[in-house]
């Protein structure tokens, strides 16, 4: 974990992401189980989003927990560790499993003004996952911050996360929209002759400091 992660952890919204894949014919059962889990997590201080992967992925489901800051995160985790509700939940879930977890990681928003409540409600999104070269974090963040207002002017809400436990060296560049129509309208403004196209052309010869490892869309289910 880089020093950037430590500096943002105390102040920005903290997220944990659990990626699940339903067993064949068990998608509805897995969603029902996630809804039950969400009600427990919310009582214990977390904000929960259940995100369905779309194009570019393999029908995975992200179970996302958010807290306002690291202190809220730690307090909630301590409650979970001694919760009888979780003992009972997992005893029931393990009797008839509906899916398997394929990955998990935590991440912090680079915008230290963001709170967990800023992510309530329904939305669709596009996310690009980047794996940064060692020692190039600040350079990559600078590029993200330069591109962010361009995409915002095209209609996207931009959130940038630095992953730590579970996915060190990863950055998740997330574009959020109210609907698929809004996503399409925004992306239609990024073609030839656009401000985005000019920016991409101006950076074409820049040093390669990160590799894009994933690019997919999705939407919330709760």
Language-model features, listed with the residues they occupy:
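Bacterial N-terminal signal peptides
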Residues: 1-5
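Short S/T/G/P-rich N-terminal loop/turn motif that feeds into the first structured element of a domain
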Residues: 10-222
């Amino acid at each position: 974990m880089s020093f950037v992660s430590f500096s943002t952890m105390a102040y920005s919204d903290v997220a944990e992401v659990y990626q699940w894949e339903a067993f064949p014919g068990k998608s509805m059962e897995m969603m029902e189980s996630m809804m039950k889990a969400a009600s427990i997590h919310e009582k214990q201080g977390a904000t929960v989003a259940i995100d369905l992967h779309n194009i570019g992925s393999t029908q995975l489901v992200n179970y996302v927990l958010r807290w306002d800051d690291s202190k809220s995160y730690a307090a909630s985790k301590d409650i979970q560790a001694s919760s009888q509700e979780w003992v009972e939940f997992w005893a029931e879930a393990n009797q008839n499993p509906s899916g398997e977890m394929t990955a998990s990681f935590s991440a912090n928003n680079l915008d230290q003004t963001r709170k967990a409540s800023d992510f309530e409600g329904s939305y669709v999104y596009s996310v690009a996952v980047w794996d940064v070269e060692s020692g190039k974090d600040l350079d990559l963040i600078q590029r993200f911050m330069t591109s962010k207002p361009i995409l915002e002017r095209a209609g996207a809400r931009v959130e940038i996360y630095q992953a730590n436990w579970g996915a060190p060296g990863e950055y998740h560049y997330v574009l959020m929209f109210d609907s698929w129509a809004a996503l399409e309208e925004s992306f239609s403004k990024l073609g030839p002759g656009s401000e985005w196209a000019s920016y991409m052309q101006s950076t074409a010869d820049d040093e390669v400091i990160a590799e894009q490892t994933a690019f997919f869309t999705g939407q919330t289910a709760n």
